[in-house]
Amino acid sequence: MMKNLNGRAHNACYHPYLHQLHQAQQLQHQQQQQQQQQQQTQLQQTPHAAHTQQNGLTQNAQPQIQWPYNSSAAANQYYQQQQQQQQQEQQMLRQRQLPTQQPAASYEQQQQQPQQHQHLQQQQQQHQLRQTFTNAATNTNAAAMAAMCQMQNFFTQQQQQQQQQEFNNNCVHINYNQQQQQQPTAAVATTTPTQKATPTKTTPTNNPTTTTNNSTTTTTTNGDKFAMDASEIASFLASELFMQQLGTFDGIQSAPTLTTPTLTPTTLRSIEETFFEMTNDAPYQAGFKPPPLAPLVNNNNNNNGNGNGNGNGNGNVLASSVVPTTTTTATIIGVSNPLISQQQQQQQQQVFDCGASVMPGSDTEESNGSWADGQMNEDQSISDTSSGATDSTSYQNGHMMGNSGGGNGGGTGGANNFSNVLAAAGRNTNTSNSATPARRGGGRRPNRSANMTPEEEEKRRIRRERNKQAAARCRKRRVDQTNELTEEVELLEKRGENLKKEMELLNETKNQLEYFLQAHRPTCQKVRADMLSVTTCNGLIGPPALLSAGSCGSGSSHHNNNSNSNDSSSGTITGLDATLNSTGRSNSPLDLKPVPIDEDLLLHIKDEPLDGALDSSSSLDQDGPPPHKRFALPNIATLMTPTGPAGSLQTPVSGTAPHGFGSFPTTISNISNISSIHNGPTLNSLNKMPKERPNTLAFQRPFGGQMQLSGSGRAPTQIQGVPIQTPSTGTFNFDSLMDGGTGLTPVSGPLIPNCTSQNKHPLELPTPTTEPSKLVSL
């Protein structure tokens, strides 16, 4: 039993084949020795006598080319060619040996000892011949070389073909090898170097004689030796593939096929199918799979396959016992032998078919036909259909397995059986196409209709028709539903695409509008309301307005100052004058209630000096409205401050007004008190708290010269017609300073402001509080 196809491990069945090879090699060497002795005896004769003898044998040769009679150099060249040819034959035979068994190796060593002795004798004889024939002409030597080359090429081709056929056929007779080797050497011995074109025409005629001994109908010549039919080509390729696969033992290739691929189970199966398609007609071609056939067994196995030298190990024991054949080579059904012609194979096939029909223990054609008819009737009533190609292939494989398996029990005469190895490889590697029927997954179990009445068959037919119609309706409904869903999906996709396009258009429009707004903003004449609004608390400016006022420009504020308004309900002051350089005064009259002041408590105060840094051309001097747009306060005795929910302020009012507030110290604490007033308690509660005031004010008198002119020695009671009423008992807070309730502002007469009485900036305004540490002294 073989373990693999690479030839690494093989069975002892190869031993007979090795012995046959050694015997053939020994006989060949003996024949070569005899031929050399004959050649030596012929060379002792004169070349003229040899030439006359050869002319008597070959009178029909072409007389165009003549050889010289005394051509010693040609004879020497001829024997050199023969020696080289013999050495090549010996090398090829050594390569075809299988040195894997130790007994075979020892036997080979025993056979090589006489071969070496013969080789030494041949070399000595050649040396003597070279010394005798050394005086040859140059032209005769060239002609002899050409003739010898042609002869050598032809003989090497013939010998290679014969040796390859000998190795492919495992049980070839030794007599066949002797005939094939004797005839070319005999032609060499009888042919002298006096002809050039004669060997190419005479020697091929000997080749058909060798092949007709084995196959009586095969005739091959040099012209049609490549004319092969389909079966011969298939068999040749199969044998080449198989021998290359099995002949590789430790780097030694038996068959020199360098272009053939590796033998695989797929190639084996395809080769088997090709053999059966071309050479064997299957008895059953109905398209279904028959049951596995029993192996063919013959009672004459012991007579034909009992391990003799020519024994058969195949499954065609019946054919070998019925038909007398001239050769005993392996002829399995579907495996063509290169030594047997196609007609002889057809005859054997016909006889084998006839014998198979009467073979005891095998299925006859009638029984198989009846079984096939019954199977067809059953399959007609069953809706299950099978593949004809697969079933026929599996049937052919199973048929071959049966034939090859039957021959294995006959004997072990055929050592290296090609068909048996193919069958074993196909059986081991191909499990899907085995002889057992493969079960198909799913489906209904076939019901046999043999025991059914016609009524039951009609009911089954009607039921199957209904099932078919229901299945068709189900398929149609499924297709319709699929189409509806597909259409709905397409509509939704289109709607989504439209929405995406609309979104893109809207985004483009938005981007364009934003670009237009950004481009129009620097040139727009309208001002946004959020940029002009100022947060107020009870008529007071809040911290956000103060912080934003410093960042806004005041270049054009004096042009639109008349549009300012104090909206105490909303808490914002709107207008273009965002800096509020007009100190937040409103155009409405102030409602202030005067408080009676004791004149005895008035102290002398110094006049406030004018701010020299401010002139009439400065921008801070002209923060207020122009003179022609200014108007005086109404002459009323009581002024009410619009403080909203905080109530009115009880601020004492004086008849004199200060010249300006530019000298008030400005601190960050005073500015931060604005936010505390905004978020702290109301102003009325702050005004009721007790406060401390200084008795004097650290101010310079602006009009000291006029006051010195008064000779009375007392301080003047008025300055430029404005009476001085100091000190006042009122509380000076932010509202009183902004609205004029300082006690120095006359309420009886009109108030005519001048440039020095305006504020420089809201940030410079003091913010007196009720805290003792933050009192403001005037």
Curated annotation (Swiss-Prot):
Residues 459-478 are annotated as: Basic motif. It is found in: Nucleus. Keywords: Activator, DNA-binding, Nucleus, Phosphoprotein, Transcription, Transcription regulation. GO terms for molecular function: DNA binding; DNA-binding transcription factor activity, RNA polymerase II-specific; RNA polymerase II cis-regulatory region sequence-specific DNA binding. InterPro entries: AP-1, bZIP, bZIP_sf. Residues 485-513 are annotated as: Leucine-zipper. Residues 99-108, 427-436, 579-589 have a biased composition (Polar residues). Residues 403-414 have a biased composition (Gly residues). The modification Phosphoserine is found at S588. Residues 457-520 form the bZIP domain. Residues 24-57, 76-130, 183-223, 294-320, 356-414, 427-478, 550-594, 756-778 are annotated as: Disordered. Transmembrane segments: none annotated. GO terms for cellular component: nucleus. It comes from the Eukaryota. Belongs to the bZIP family. Fos subfamily. Developmentally regulated transcription factor AP-1 binds and recognizes the enhancer DNA sequence: 5'-TGA[CG]TCA-3'. May play a role in the function or determination of a particular subset of cells in the developing embryo. It is able to carry out its function either independently of or in conjunction with Jra. Homodimer. Heterodimer with Jra. The kay-Jra heterodimer binds more stably to the AP-1 site than either of the two proteins alone. PANTHER family: ACTIVATING TRANSCRIPTION FACTOR 3-RELATED, FOS TRANSCRIPTION FACTOR-RELATED. This is Transcription factor kayak.
